[in-house]
Amino acid sequence: MTELKTRNFVVGITGASGAVYGIRLTETLLSLGYTVHLVVSGAGWRVFKEELGYAVSDREGLLTGLFGSYPGSLLYHPVQDIGASIASGSFRTEGMIIMPCSMGTLSAVAHGSSDNLMTRAADVMLKEGRPLVLVPRETPLHAIHLENMLKLSRMGVKLIPAMPAFYYGPSTMDDLVNFMVGKVLDSFNIEHTLFRRWGE
């Protein structure tokens, strides 16, 4: 029987505001000993630079600095690498999370447009019946956004909009980020202590 800690998760980070969400998710999965297959879109790298101040000229060096100290394994796949392992349904994973998910990527997934590794990996989740979680970060929403989200929801995709709660008394930005990451982990029944639950 495969031990839980050896399982693979795919994490996508797009150019939507909130790259810190995807980074925290990756950190948390790696800290729990999981294997993470990471895909960052071109616009996602720009958000790394603009929002977080990271130097992105040496991408693999940056990722090693961010994630190299965790017990889990990180495998980085360039978004153009359509032949990567995660592009095939025969490669087994527990599911995929795109966090944050831009409306452009959400639309591509909704319409089966798999012209890069991010959207192809999401398409694989759908065709293989594996969990796919999207964390859209956009406001306000217009009708096309809502129609695409409804279409994906009807296909079994879990949508967890980046809408942190306040009932648990967050006092820092980290608290808000951890809440959203915790909600994603909840969708995979992964135990965590990232936020205080209602009634605790």
Language-model features, listed with the residues they occupy:
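A cross-family phosphate/adenosyl-ligand binding-site feature
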Residues: 2-133, 139-200
